[in-house]
């Protein structure tokens, strides 16, 4: 188990595979909102982490710049227990949906749907996470 942040949120990467990643967060004090559920911003962060880390598994940060464009969250159920997100993307999807487009375009915006569930398998929320992916050679403003 990898720990992304030991404090204050205890977000844990519990599984990394070739095509998927799973991240969990507990219902601890630092993750709660005013009604003792898991805070909406933590749930959005889980969606961003899962999709972003998955992209980093497939794209070298030396070759590609990956920037978050937008997050749109829809909340379905109040999270009162630990939550987890599993994001899956295959090498074939990367090739067909991103790399093929980058052969003819400088950048691509790719939106991913990411779902968060609690320990009882309740669907807590869905995040639509939109990333810009661009080869560094096409970046005009250098870091």
Question: Predicted segment positions?
Answer:
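Hydrophobic core residues within well-ordered beta-strands of beta-rich domains
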Residues: 7, 67, 83, 108-112, ...
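A short, structured loop/turn motif at beta-sheet edges
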Residues: 15-20, 76-82, 117-122
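HotDog/MaoC-like acyl-thioester-processing domains
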Residues: 90-143
């Amino acid at each position: 188990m990898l720990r992304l942040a030991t404090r204050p949120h205890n977000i844990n990467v519990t599984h990394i595979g070739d095509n998927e990643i799973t991240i969990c967060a507990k219902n601890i004090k630092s993750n709660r909102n005013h009604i003792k559920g898991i805070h909406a911003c933590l749930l959005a962060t889980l969606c961003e982490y899962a999709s972003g880390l998955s992209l980093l598994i497939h794209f070298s940060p030396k070759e590609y710049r990956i920037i978050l464009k937008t997050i749109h969250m829809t909340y379905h159920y109040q999270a009162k227990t630990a939550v987890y997100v599993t994001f899956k993307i295959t090498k074939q999807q990367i090739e067909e949906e991103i790399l093929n487009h980058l052969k003819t375009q400088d950048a691509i915006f790719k939106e991913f749907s990411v779902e968060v569930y609690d320990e009882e398998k309740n669907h807590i929320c869905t995040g639509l996470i939109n990333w810009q992916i661009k080869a560094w050679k096409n970046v005009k403003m250098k870091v």
